Amino acid sequence: MKTTALITALLSLSMTAQADPLVIEDGYYGGDDHGYGDVIGNTGQFDVYRAELSQVGSILTVDIYTAFAGRADDGLFSAYTYNGMGIGYGDLFLASAWDPDGTAPYLDDDNVTGTVWEYGFSLDDRWDANGGNGTLYALTGSNDDSALLAEDFMSGAIYRNGQEIAVDLSDEAANFRSQLAGGTWTVNGDHLTFAIDLTGSDLSLANGIALHWGPSCGNDIIEGYADVPEPGSLGLLALGLIGAGVARRRR
């Protein structure tokens, strides 16, 4: 009985640990950083800290922890944005594999040299104070075919150009995107939450997901890959105890 109770407890702890969100820490700079490193400009405005990913059924939830949360409606640097509304939230790009150029912090990685993003979650209003709805698109062709870059939003200032910011919804790019499912996004204090229905896609967190996100200036970009870890040591210990118990009963 004591062994059975111990095994149950260990398995419970193991499953609880694996149910925790998968975390991508921001170790990505990307090009072009113009010599600034991880963050161009004020870290108190643009720093991106980490992404946390979890999935229940077909719904992928991505939490982006960033100093930019809650600032898209502030009209930051509006004089340097083409529409005069300031810097907004970028769309979330996803792929089944991550193929950055070079090694960390990937200073030469950009829209040409890096990962070709397979999916994009397009926000309905990237300047909204609270959040809204979004649409998941399957993307084809190159990043230049399917995405808008920071330079499509900014001009006349130093920013991280060469980074994917948004799904290109223009008529010219129509052949490079296919609408799939929907989702929502919300602004929650120190982070943004994207809840995306993966129905119709080939994505699953169980198989690993790469992501790319940043504000529309690209002043800090987070990019990386999350996959389910190997069974934890507690789980392996529990399985070992189960095996030992079975062996004893057979003697």
Describe the role of every protein-language-model region.
Residues 4-13, 237-240:
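Sec-dependent N-terminal signal peptides
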Residues 12, 28, 242-244:
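A general, composition-driven signal for non-globular sequence regions
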Residues 15-19:
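Sec/Tat signal peptide C-region and signal peptidase I cleavage site
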Residues 20-227:
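Surface-exposed extracytoplasmic segments
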Residues 229-248:
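A short, hydrophobic C-terminal helix/tail in secreted or cell-surface proteins
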